[in-house]
Amino acid sequence: MVRPLKPSQIRRLVRRPGIRKHRNSLRYKMRIKQGDTVQVISGDDKGKIGEVLRVFPERNMVLVEGVNIVTYHRKPQREGESGRIETKEAPIPVCKVMAYSKKQEVASRIGYQITADGRKVRVLKKTGEILD
């Protein structure tokens, strides 16, 4: 006779995509930082410009203001409370955004340069504008 599996055993068998939780989880090198202005270069929101609100290096994703808006239908939590519809930004892969220069209104890749005082700074390759 075969015994049914416990929920904890089922969880171990089913592989779920997502973040690895152990200490040595993979972190991607992010050239885009929080507060940068970026332009979306592919996908449904192509051409939109926004500020990076948050960076997720372990998932290789960024949260951009006004981009990838998702809708949540919330059930009422307490008696007498009505349900509601919420909209908010969802993260998008960092490969779908490019740093954007507000001065010259052009998107560009990011490079690095050593300044005269020895600091390593991020630079827009098309315009030469320093980001840091």
From Swiss-Prot:
What's a single GO MF annotation on this record?
Answer: structural constituent of ribosome
Q: Which SUPFAM superfamilies match?
A: Translation proteins SH3-like domain
Coiled coil, from the record:
none
Which Gene Ontology CC terms are recorded? ribonucleoprotein complex; ribosome
The highest taxon in the source lineage is Bacteria
Keywords from UniProt, A to Z, are:
Ribonucleoprotein, Ribosomal protein, RNA-binding, rRNA-binding
Q: Name one Pfam family in it.
A: ribosomal_L24
Q: Which processes are annotated in GO (biological process)?
A: translation
Q: Please describe what this protein does.
A: One of two assembly initiator proteins, it binds directly to the 5'-end of the 23S rRNA, where it nucleates assembly of the 50S subunit.
Say which family it is in: Belongs to the universal ribosomal protein uL24 family.
**What subunit structure does UniProt give?**
Part of the 50S ribosomal subunit.
**Family matches, as HAMAP family:** Ribosomal_uL24_B
Q: What is the recorded name of this protein?
A: Large ribosomal subunit protein uL24
Name of the gene: rplX
